[in-house]
């Protein structure tokens, strides 16, 4: 979606948008960085017979269809794109299988004890030799349902069995392996989507 014109190059840049294409940065931070969104005349309609996967990468904004690249980057004053990282939205297993967090989050949204959640890929802290990411979930509990003044351990004892029930509906490689209890709100974009890359950065 980007190319570098022969007459104008910039070191480190991925280039400008292709002709008739558009690039924009979703909800940029103080450094102008955010997820790179792409619009082109040849943008795919979606993934074959996989509506959830399609929704995870293509969004209609003001009547235009935009592709969520999963890349984090910024545009300079001349419209050149610089890639600075990945949003790590899709979790890729060592066998090359893709896990879409939105699919798992949809199932978790039906759990009354969970107010809000974010699924992401995380390094296994118990096994540093294992480089494969495990499926982890950050959960904001529904305190109106489970009660207040509970310790994290008590909250875990309530919510983990619910997660195990959700895991039964998933293929084994998509199963949630780690639960994190979150007490503050998620950082969100102007369209009220969770800033995944910002939340993941907090773990580092």
Model-derived features: where do they sit?
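Conserved A3 ("GATE") glycine/threonine-rich loop of ANL adenylate-forming enzymes
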Residues: 1-5, 18-20, 99
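Conserved loop-to-beta-strand segment in the C-terminal subdomain of adenylate-forming
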Residues: 124-148, 168-181
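C-terminal boundary motif of the adenylate-forming
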Residues: 26, 70-72, 110-141
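Adenylate-forming
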Residues: 43, 80-109, 143-153, 170-176
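Active-site loops of AMP-binding adenylate-forming
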Residues: 1-11, 50-53
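Conserved C-terminal "lid"/linker of ANL adenylate-forming enzymes
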Residues: 118-121, 160, 164-204
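Conserved ATP-binding/catalytic segment of the ANL
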Residues: 30-93, 101
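AMP-dependent adenylate-forming
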Residues: 80-84, 89-90, 130-133, 196-203
């Amino acid at each position: 979606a980007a190319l570098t014109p022969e007459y104008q190059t910039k070191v480190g840049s991925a280039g400008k948008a292709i002709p008739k294409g558009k690039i924009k940065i979703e909800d940029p931070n103080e450094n102008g960085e955010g997820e790179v969104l792409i619009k082109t005349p040849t943008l795919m309609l979606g993934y074959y017979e996989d509506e959830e996967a399609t929704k995870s990468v293509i969004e209609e904004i003001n009547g235009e269809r935009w592709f969520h690249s999963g890349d984090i980057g910024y545009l300079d004053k001349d419209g050149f794109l610089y890639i600075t990282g990945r949003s790590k939205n899709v979790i890729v297993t060592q066998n090359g299988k893709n896990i879409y967090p939105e699919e798992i989050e949809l199932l978790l949204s039906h759990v009354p004890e969970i107010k809000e959640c974010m699924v992401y890929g995380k390094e296994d802290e118990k096994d540093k030799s294992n480089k494969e990411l495990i499926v982890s979930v950050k959960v904001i509990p529904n305190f109106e349902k489970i009660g207040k003044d509970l310790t994290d351990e008590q909250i875990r004892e309530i919510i983990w069995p619910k997660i195990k029930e959700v895991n039964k509906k998933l293929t084994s490689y998509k199963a949630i392996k780690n639960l994190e209890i979150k007490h503050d709100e998620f950082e969100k974009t102007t369209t009220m989507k969770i800033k995944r890359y910002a939340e993941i950065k907090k773990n580092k």
